[in-house]
A protein has these predicted regions:
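Conserved C-terminal helix/tail region of periplasmic/extracytoplasmic solute-binding proteins
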Residues: 169-196
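Phosphate-coordinating loops and pocket residues in cytosolic domains that bind phosphorylated ligands
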Residues: 6, 69, 185
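Bilobed "Venus flytrap"/periplasmic-binding protein-like clamshell domains
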Residues: 1-66, 122, 158-163
Length: 196
C-alpha cells in the first residue's frame, strides 16, 4: 500500500471500498491526501485500470475476481482484519413497522438460500454467472470470498457503520454528523425469534 503514494487510484466514491482504502492507507502510514482518488463507477474503473489511466483500482467482488482472473491484477490488501463489510436489505420505515412478520420470513428465506450457496458455491456460480455476465469460475471465486449469514442488524454492525459514517463526515463526504442508531429499524422480539 505504501507504493500507492502519489498514484492515481480508481474507486467508487462513498462506498465500502472508499472506507477500505482510507483504512488500508492509514495502516501503511498514509492518508487519502497522499494519493489522487479518481471517482468512477465499477465499469469505468475497470476500463481506467485496464488502460493504465489509473495505477490501482479499489473494487468489490465479482469485479475484483474478474480483474484478478481476466487482467491478472494483484490484490494489494483486502479488508480482512481491517474493516467490517456488510451488505444490507432495505425496506421503508413504514413497511418495516407494519409488516415485521414479512421481514422475519424474508430473513429466514435468505438464511436458507445463503446456506445452500455456502454448501454448493459452484452450483450457485453456474446459476448467477449468466445473470452477471461473467464466467462461472469467476463467479465461484467471488462467491467463495463472501459470507451468506443473513441476520437482523446487531449493535456491533451499528457501531461499525457509525465508524464509517464518522470517517466519511471527517472526509467531507457526508455534510454533517449522523447517528446510525437513529436510522436503523429494530425488529420486535417476536420477529427476531421467528427468523431463528
Amino acid at each position: 500500500m505504501a507504493g500507492l503514494k502519489g498514484k492515481k487510484v480508481a474507486l467508487n466514491k462513498g462506498s465500502n471500498v472508499h472506507y477500505l482504502l482510507v483504512r488500508a492507507l492509514e495502516e501503511a502510514g498514509l492518508s487519502i491526501r497522499d494519493i489522487t482518488p479518481v471517482y468512477l463507477p465499477p465499469a469505468d474503473g475497470r476500463a481506467a485500470f485496464e488502460s493504465r489511466r489509473v495505477d490501482a483500482w479499489v473494487i468489490w467482488d465479482p469485479f475484483q475476481a474478474a480483474a484478478e482472473e481476466q487482467l491478472r491484477a494483484r490484490t494489494l490488501r483486502d479488508g480482512s482484519g481491517l474493516v467490517d463489510n456488510h451488505q444490507f436489505y432495505l425496506a421503508s420505515q413504514t413497511f418495516a413497522e407494519r409488516h415485521p412478520g414479512v421481514i422475519a420470513l424474508l430473513v429466514e428465506e435468505l438464511k436458507q438460500v445463503g446456506s445452500e450457496v455456502e454448501r454448493d458455491p459452484r452450483q450457485a456460480a453456474e446459476i448467477i454467472a449468466p445473470l452477471i455476465g461473467l464466467p462461472a469460475d469467476i463467479a465461484a471465486k467471488a462467491l467463495g470470498r463472501q459470507a451468506f449469514q443473513t441476520q437482523f442488524i446487531t449493535p456491533e454492525v451499528v457501531e461499525a457503520q457509525q465508524r464509517i459514517a464518522d470517517t466519511f463526515t471527517d472526509l467531507k463526504l457526508i455534510p454533517k454528523r449522523l447517528s446510525i442508531r437513529d436510522v436503523v429499524w429494530t425488529p420486535p422480539a417476536s420477529a427476531v425469534a421467528q427468523s431463528r
